[in-house]
Structure formats: C-alpha cells, structure tokens
C-alpha cells in the first residue's frame, strides 16, 4: 500500500500557488483494508475514503472505461493491481497528472512538469475525448491560469473541437455545465473561458445565446470593437476588475443578448435590445438552472442599463419608478449591482477601458435623497391608505427634482 498526493495540490505547489484542498491516491490497497484501518467510505461510483483523523479524501487507484455517453458513461475498475501510472493516465491534463509520494519525490510519467515550464494545458492521452466535461474544465483552467501565461496546446484544442462536433456535449447535465461556468466566472480572467469555448466550437452548443452575438455589428462611433460578442467579453473582463460578485459578472455577460435579435435592416443600431433580451436571459437561466439571484439581477441590468447610461436626461419621476422597479428600497445592493454592470458595459470597449462614468455617482445620490423621505412623517401629517404611498412618491420625486435644479444652476452660462 502506497499513498501519493495528487492533482491540484501538487500542481499548485509547483506553480507557487496557495494549496486549498489535498487529494490522496492509494495504490495497492482494497476497500476492505481501508475500512480496517479506520477510513470511512464516501464514494458511490468509485472507492473514496475519508481519513479517520483529518477527514481528507483518499481514493483507490482506478481505471475507467467508456461504456456510454456523457461524462458519467464510464465503468470503474479499482483494485490493488492498478498502478500509479495507470491511474494518472485517466486524468485530463498533464499538469494534473503529477503525484508526490510520502518521501516528497515527484512522479511525473506524462510530462506535466515540462508543460508547467512551457505554460501548456495539454491532454494526457487520447482518452481525453471520452469525457465531454473536459472541454469545460480545460476552458476553466485556461481562464484560471491565463494570468500565468498558460494556453491550450494546439493538439488539445483539436481534441476539444472533435468533442464539440461529436454530439457528446449535449449529454452534459445542466448542473455540470453551470457548475463549470460559475467556477469560471470566479476566476480573474472569466472571458477567457468563453473565448476558448468559442475557439473549439463548444460555445455554440452550450451557450448559443452568447455565440449568437459574434458577428453582430454595433455603431463604430460608440463601439470601436464593433462586434457585439467581442464587446460582451471585454465587458466581462471589466466586470472582473470591478468586483468579485459573480452575480454582477453574470449579469454583465448576458446584458446585450437582445442585440442578436435586432433586424438586419436596422443594424448596426439595436433599438430596445435590453427588453428584447429578457426572454433570452430567462431561457438561458432556466436551461442551465442558474440561481434566481443571478437571474433577477441579469434581467434588471438588461432592462435598465440604457436608462442608467442616459441618467442625466431622465425625469425625477422616471428615476423613482426605476428605484421602485428594482426594489432598491428593500435591496439597495441590487442598485450597486446594476451600476457596476453599467460601468463594465461602458468600459468594455476597445480603447475606452478607463472611461469615467459619472452616472453612477449621480444615480446613487438621487437614490439617497429619495431614501431620506420618511414615511412616519407622512403618516404624522395625516395621510392614510393609498395616499401615504402617493405622497411618499411625490416627495421622493420632489427631492430629486430639487437636486437636478441645483445642478442646472451650477452650470456656467
């Protein structure tokens, strides 16, 4: 019985990154022996055990054979005769197929250390094509390690394209697709995830609403990058610089889906694209079972981002209506999410990444003024029933109007 540290812990140590989780591989043992040593079995599909003291995971070495479609269409053979090399052979990337024994010696039969040196995400074997989930995993690793200079090896990208054409991606469950997407959104370079999927043909299969944006032109006056797909990913990058909040990043990703529905004769203009995108966002979120808070913010951003961009031209009554619609009185963090996504939208344009966005401070100030209106004072003044809400609305509008008038007076003649 031999025990090895494997996978991400070894890889991250070699990259000089913080190690979060440790996974161990056990070679030359059986479930019966593990149980006799006090380990507790937790794996249903293959033998995984928890250490009796530290509760870390220990998996028996195994061989997998393709038996059906999708990422779970495999049979598992875990026995005491499976070697370290055989277990590492089934792993996705060479950088994830390095093991460290109890003496600290590295075992690297497939060249993972060389690929770390050369910053390559490379498949271990041709069996890579048997698991469609690996397309998403490699794209996620490309996003995660982009800042370190990693790229997908040419031959690995070819295999990813092969999987995309095979129909295997359609067998992935919504939960697994969203899980990988959400983990990619949490990286420092989330846009790279979608760039890699587009490059191998998987974007069209798994995220057709985003794929449809590529090739859709926008007015060059406002969008030097012209292409809506490019703008979307540039905006996502800007969102990642502004916030770690994944709901805001997701809302930024889907804020312009409606532009794919603009009539060809009206291009490059996109009248009402925010509202046209609402059914597409709902469809996207329902298909992939996106969390409700992500969906709700995404719908708000799509519906209102043009209004926020035009904030200085909006009437006070329109602003109060916007605050009502966004439920900002109860959930002020939603206003922050909306404004952050709008900033990312404005800065997600080639050459305009440093653009100022005074609309955000203006909207925030208007909201704070409206929020200062006290309901208790309205009740004390004798208003009852529906008149309370009407007076509250009137005073909120008045507060914003007075502020707007003060700004006009400050302007030079």
Swiss-Prot record:
Transmembrane segments: none annotated. Gene3D superfamilies: Beta Polymerase, domain 2 (3.30.460.10), cca-adding enzyme, domain 2 (1.10.3090.10). This is Multifunctional CCA protein. The gene is cca. Monomer. Can also form homodimers and oligomers. Keywords: ATP-binding, Hydrolase, Magnesium, Metal-binding, Multifunctional enzyme, Nickel, Nucleotide-binding, Nucleotidyltransferase, RNA repair, RNA-binding, Transferase, tRNA processing. NCBIfam families: PRK10885.1. ATP binds at residues 8, 11, 91, 137, 140.
């Amino acid at each position: 019985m031999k025990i090895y540290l494997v996978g991400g812990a070894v890889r991250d140590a070699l990259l000089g990154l913080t190690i979060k989780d440790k996974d161990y591989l056990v070679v030359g043992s059986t479930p019966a022996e593990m149980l006799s040593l006090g380990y507790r079995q937790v794996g249903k599909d293959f033998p995984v055990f928890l250490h009796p003291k530290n509760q870390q995971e220990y998996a028996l070495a195994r061989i997998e054979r393709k038996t059906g479609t999708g990422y779970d269409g495999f049979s598992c053979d875990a026995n005491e005769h499976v070697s370290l090399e055989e277990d590492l052979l089934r792993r996705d990337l060479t950088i994830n197929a390095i093991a460290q024994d109890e003496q600290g010696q590295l075992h690297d039969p497939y060249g993972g250390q060389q690929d770390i040196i050369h910053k390559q995400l490379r498949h271990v074997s041709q069996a890579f094509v048997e698991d469609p989930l690996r397309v998403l995993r490699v794209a996620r690793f490309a996003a995660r390690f982009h800042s370190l200079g990693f790229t997908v090896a040419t031959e690995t990208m070819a295999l990813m394209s092969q999987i995309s054409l095979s129909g295997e991606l359609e067998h992935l469950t919504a939960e697994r697709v969203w899980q990988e997407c959400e983990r990619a959104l949490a990286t420092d370079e989330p846009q790279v995830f979608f760039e890699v999927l587009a490059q191998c043909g998987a974007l069209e299969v798994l995220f057709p609403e985003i794929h449809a944006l590529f090739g859709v032109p926008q007015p060059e006056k406002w969008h030097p990058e012209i292409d809506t797909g490019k703008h979307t990913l540039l905006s996502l990058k800007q969102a990642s610089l502004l916030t770690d909040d994944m709901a805001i990043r997701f809302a930024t990703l889907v804020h312009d889906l409606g532009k794919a529905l603009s009539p060809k004769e009206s291009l490059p203009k996109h009248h009402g694209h925010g509202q046209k995108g609402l059914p597409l966002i709902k469809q996207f979120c329902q298909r992939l079972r996106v969390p409700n808070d992500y969906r709700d913010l995404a719908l708000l951003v799509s519906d209102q981002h043009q209004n926020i961009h035009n904030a200085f031209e909006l009437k006070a009554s329109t602003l109060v209506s916007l605050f009502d619609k966004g439920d900002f009185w109860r959930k002020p963090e939603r206003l922050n999410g909306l404004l952050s996504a709008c900033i990312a939208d404005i800065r997600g344009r080639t050459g305009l990444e440093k653009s100022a966005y005074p609309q955000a401070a203006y909207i925030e100030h208007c909201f704070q003024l409206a929020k200062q209106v006290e309901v208790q004072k309205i009740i004390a003044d004798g208003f009852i029933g529906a008149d309370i809400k009407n007076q509250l609305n009137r005073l909120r509008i008045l507060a914003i109007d007075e502020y707007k008038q003060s700004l006009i007076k400050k302007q030079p003649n």
